Amino acid sequence: HQKIIEEAPAPGLSDEQRRAMGAAAVRAAEAIGYEGAGTVEFLLAPDGEFFFMEMNTRLQVEHPVTELITGQDLVAWQLQVADGAPLPLAQNEIPLNGAAMEVRAYAEDPARGFLPSAGTLTRAHWPRENVRVDTGFEEGDTVSDHYDPMVAKIIAHGSDRDRARRRLCQGLRQTRLTGIRHNLDFLLRVLESEPFAAAELDTRLLELHAELLEVP
């Protein structure tokens, strides 16, 4: 499976499940005496049971959605803890505000099995209102075939899930990339699709809605 859109808080996850996952993640880190930034991944079954997948000893691509709903700079936290400082806040001191969504802008062709598309960015225009854009690419830069083809992360925050989704859609419409094939239109189709808007999600989304991969 491929990560396409990330969001926080996770839709369909109860507060009880969220607390249980958090406690399990803490126990996993404590069991090996781990100190530092880390990301524990779980897979949620339809019956509400969850299963450990993996732990990455770092922040992950999707950390901005957590930053936007908590108002915290996790990169700064990571560096402070690595320098021997305690965590700035305890778990019960971390605020949760609204919802956030992130898409990964890739130089790839979704209709051809997400085949990477190397080339030179002849135009790269990123949105500036109501979204956050994390990127290291500018016009004239080359997307190499030797590395991951992600060119940017576009993230939106809103008072609720639908507002965040709509802001992200607006941001995608304002983005312009030329010189490479990209997944922006595909991302917009997914965000605007009925199952995604209704948060009717599982790992079979594209399998059940293959039309989202098709170019209109």
PLM regions with names:
Residues 1-216:
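ATP-dependent carboxylate activation and anion-phosphoryl transfer catalytic cores
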